[in-house]
Design a protein with these regions (language model features):
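Short amphipathic alpha-helix with an adjacent loop that forms part of the alpha/beta core around
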Residues: 177-192
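Active-site neighborhood of HAD-like aspartate-dependent phosphohydrolases
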Residues: 1-54
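Acidic, Mg2+-coordinating phosphoryl-transfer loop and its flanking beta/alpha structural elements
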Residues: 136-177
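Metal-dependent phosphoesterase signature
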Residues: 30-34, 42-81
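Substrate-recognition "cap/lid" segment bordering the active-site pocket of phosphatases
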Residues: 92-147
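Short acidic-hydrophobic, aromatic-tinged amphipathic segments that line or gate anion-handling sites
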Residues: 120-124, 170-181
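Substrate-recognition element of Asp-dependent hydrolases with the DxDx(T/V) motif
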Residues: 66-72, 76-106, 110
Length: 195
């Protein structure tokens, strides 16, 4: 029995903030960088007014093929390939609902870069309903909720500038080598320990 690994996409595999930062700077006539986003909500981190936040979110929703054009984080392709040698991988990701092509583009992006097919992708904001042995996400709040529902699972915070201030007592890394080692030693869900 192999372990089942649930991977978030944005912030773990794809550089969502790097993709939307040019939109933010264009709309607001600013020069923010990804490092300026020090919490999960970019609107809160950048201290955007409600009108500014709405304008940016509308732009994200209206930008064709945004999800298809996001950059892959360095090391992610090789990291996923290595983990697939020892575990099942499913991508559990939220959709940007106002962007009509988001899910289609995300599926094509995952297939193109990682050879992950549509049967291995779950679109949901309710990630806690997904069962796995290891769950990797950049949103600390999502990890905590998943762990509440799967107390024998292993939740891994993927380190980013926007979660570095979060309180988290569990696994935390942005190293594919370290994640590989974590997955190697996880006992798959449902297997019994023989004494």
């Amino acid at each position: 029995v192999t372990a089942r690994v649930l991977l978030d996409c944005d912030g773990v595999l794809s550089d969502f903030m790097g993709g939307v930062m040019p939109l933010i700077n264009s709309i607001l006539e600013t020069s923010y960088t990804v490092d300026d986003v020090t919490e999960f909500s970019f609107a809160a981190a950048l201290k955007l007014t409600p009108d500014q936040a709405s304008a940016v979110k509308r732009s994200i929703g209206r930008t064709p093929r945004l999800a298809a054009n996001l950059n892959v984080y360095p090391g992610a392709v090789d990291g996923v390939r290595r983990i697939r040698e020892i575990a099942e991988i499913y991508v559990v990701t939220s959709s940007w609902d106002s962007n009509e092509t988001w899910e289609f583009d995300r599926k094509a992006w995952l297939k193109r870069h990682f050879d992950i097919g549509h049967h291995d992708i779950v679109f949901t904001a309710a990630k806690h309903i997904c069962v796995g042995d290891v769950f990797v996400d950049d949103r600390t709040e999502t990890l905590a909720k998943w762990l509440e529902h799967h107390p024998t699972g292993t939740a891994v915070q993927w380190q980013t500038p926007h979660n570095r201030r979060d309180r988290w007592n569990g696994w935390s890394t942005n190293s594919w080598d370290e994640l590989f080692r974590i997955v190697e030693f996880v006992r798959p869900f449902g297997t019994e320990v023989v004494a």
